[in-house]
Amino acid sequence: MIQSYKNWINNSYSQIKENYVEINNLDQKLGDGDHGSTILKGLDTAVANLNIISSEDLSFFMSEISKLMRISMGGASGILMTIFIKEIGNINYDNFRLSILDIFSTTIDKIKKRGKVNFRDKSILDIYIPVYDEIFANDVIHINRILDVLDNALESTKNMEANVGRAKFLDTKGIGITDPGAFSTTLILKEFFKEFVNEKNN
């Protein structure tokens, strides 16, 4: 079971490594300019420790991975970007869909509280909520629909005015720019669903 999680982390690292420069470029327009490098650093730390953490307890394993990432990344990104990675360790394969809904719900609540952010504030929350809604509305998780929802949710952040972080000081000048955190979150969630969603898990 844990091997699938290792695959997910490795694949997420590959996607972020391929796109981190573009993510940084977006963040230069909206924030500190280093979000791509920061999430890459966190995932690099995760990958380096995948075979060092010697535990078959999934909850403990993912908690340790998320902690190492959080420390490596630091700041708000470290806190918010690792919430899902920790929570996914609580997955229940006996009822995969309901378990995913619970994990997304918990992740969304924690992002709201810790990030002081709401839906359509131009943040990672604008990725998690549409995915939750898609899974909630259907009895089966359809991978192609999830991937479409992720793409559409990411695209929608372009038209939002930022209400959090440094980007909020841009007022309407940030409209037309994709949120970098939403970009990295989309890449990571795509790799998660590609790794875990199949007929057996629905």
Language model regions located:
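N-terminal loops that bind phosphate or other acidic moieties
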Residues: 1-202
